[in-house]
A protein has these predicted regions:
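Short cytosolic juxtamembrane segments of multi-pass membrane proteins
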Residues: 181-185
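Terminal transmembrane helical anchor/hairpin motif
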Residues: 101-178
Length: 185
């Protein structure tokens, strides 16, 4: 949440906005920096995949598609966080707004299960991930629905890829619009 909120708080956002960089370049640069940092952390977790291959014979498909899905999920959540960070100079406000958006996108499955017809179908289309519980003995803590479930099963779905890329693009665009509006205030 420090990506843009800290810049606003310290007054360095004005320096960035008066530089020859366009707002899109600033937002995209901060997004790529956060995504690379996240991918380094994901890369460090590949140690566990190595241990799996040393002590067993796992199926490589779900492992690789899980990493692809995790990358796409991370890009979507980072874009939402960057947008929330652009809205306020307070990091806590950015955290609350970003968490609220992500929670809303996650619990859509819970809400849509209690609806029927077109409303349920529309809400299912906007679900970020599956709401699952470690206490649910039927799912064993694995997402059974949502856009991430196919990646966890080893299936690459163009619909799921397009969804995560769309969420990422929409929230990056909204972040650019917030910064452009700030310039004109």
């Amino acid at each position: 949440m420090r990506l843009l909120a800290e810049e606003q708080k310290l007054g360095t956002l004005e320096l960035l906005l008066t530089s020859p960089l366009r707002e899109f370049e600033i937002v995209f640069g901060k997004f790529i920096a956060a995504l690379v940092t996240t991918m380094v952390m994901v890369g460090l977790s590949l140690y566990f995949v190595l241990v799996l291959f040393v002590y067993g014979d796992p199926d490589i498909g779900p492992l690789l598609t899980g990493l692809v899905g995790l990358t796409l999920y991370a890009s979507a959540t980072l874009a939402v966080g960057l947008f929330a960070s652009a809205l306020s100079s307070n990091q806590i406000v950015g955290l609350v707004v970003g968490s609220g958006i992500l929670t809303t996108l996650t619990i859509i499955d819970f809400v849509s299960a209690r609806l029927s017809g077109t409303a349920a179908q529309v809400m299912d289309a906007f679900q970020l991930g599956a709401s699952f519980s470690v206490f649910d003995l039927d799912s064993f803590g694995v997402a059974e629905g949502g856009h991430f479930a196919d990646f966890a099963r080893g299936i690459i779905s163009v619909t799921d890829i397009a969804y995560y890329l769309s969420i990422t693009a929409v929230f990056l665009l909204l972040t650019v619009l917030v910064l452009e509006a700030r310039r004109w205030r």
